[in-house]
């Protein structure tokens, strides 16, 4: 059967509209979890204020130079802040991926679904999803740090891994290998969707500071919710595409 991107886009749009409130609630809950965890594990305001003490920002040629000019205590605070942001983001993304994929599975099975039920049903697979998303993020970030393009290619090749891990109950590394093979064979269908997702995420990041006009916490929740909705659309598309490819 010939698969066209247009038909998958149409199916994705229909599902997103029909299940919008449930997906919105899952996105909002994941955003709230991300922000709360980030706040809990982040350094205090007093500690963060120390990062500006005695660091010659204007004379630093880059990030590594800036870090080298910090005291050991400031470097520890920066590391804690980065770790808190990364950890909370990974937790939120894992819950989002599990929740959205479970919504699709439950709706496809003709069952009634709510945001809490979807997240609860995804609980057994969250540890594997967390590891998968951590490894994927690590590989993509390393690729982007090199010359950008390898990172984008890795993001495309590993895009189907979360769907395969949940739908086919694969292991973490098995889903990554299978995703690379399957995506490579269907690059014309996967690449445009992932590139559009990356572009939308980048644009949202550029305008994220405007959300802080409310309060930093509310702005962070709103920005994360929009980011989660964008990711949810991609997950729906990838799930539908994967099911069509398997037929």
UniProtKB/Swiss-Prot annotation:
Major site of localization recorded for this protein: membrane
Record key words, sorted: Cell inner membrane, Cell membrane, Membrane, Transmembrane, Transmembrane helix
Topology in membrane: Multi-pass membrane protein
Subcellular location(s) of the protein: Cell inner membrane
GO cellular component, one term: plasma membrane
A Pfam family that the UniProt record links to this protein: UPF0259
TM region positions: 20-40, 87-107, 118-140, 152-172, 187-209, 225-245
InterPro entries, A to Z: UPF0259 (IPR009627)
HAMAP family found in the cross-reference section: UPF0259
Similarity comment text for this entry: Belongs to the UPF0259 family.
Protein name, UniProt field: UPF0259 membrane protein YciC
Organism of origin: Escherichia coli O1:K1 / APEC
Organism classification: Bacteria, Pseudomonadati, Pseudomonadota, Gammaproteobacteria, Enterobacterales
Gene from which the chain derives: yciC
């Amino acid at each position: 059967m010939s698969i066209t991107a247009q038909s998958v886009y149409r199916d994705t749009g229909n599902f997103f509209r029909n299940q919008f409130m449930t997906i919105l609630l899952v996105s909002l809950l994941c955003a709230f979890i991300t922000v709360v965890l980030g706040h809990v594990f982040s350094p205090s305001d007093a500690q963060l204020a120390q990062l500006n003490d005695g660091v010659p920002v204007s004379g630093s040629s880059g990030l590594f130079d800036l870090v080298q000019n910090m005291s050991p205590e400031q470097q520890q605070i920066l590391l804690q802040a980065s770790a808190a942001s990364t950890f909370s983001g990974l937790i939120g993304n894992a819950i989002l991926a599990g929740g959205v994929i479970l919504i699709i599975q439950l709706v496809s099975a003709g069952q009634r679904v709510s945001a809490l039920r979807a997240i609860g049903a995804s609980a057994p697979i969250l540890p594997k999803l967390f590891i998968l998303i951590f490894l994927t993020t690590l590989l993509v970030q390393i690729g982007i740090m090199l010359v950008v393009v390898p990172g984008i290619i890795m993001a495309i090749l590993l895009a189907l891994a979360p769907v395969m891990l949940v739908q086919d109950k694969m292991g973490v590394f098995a889903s990554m290998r299978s995703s690379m093979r399957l995506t490579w064979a269907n690059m014309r269908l996967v690449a445009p969707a992932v590139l559009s997702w990356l572009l939308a995420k980048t644009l949202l990041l550029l305008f994220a500071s405007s959300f802080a006009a409310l309060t930093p916490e509310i702005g962070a929740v709103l920005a994360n919710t929009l980011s989660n909705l964008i990711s949810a659309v991609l997950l729906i598309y990838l799930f539908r595409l994967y099911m069509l490819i398997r037929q």
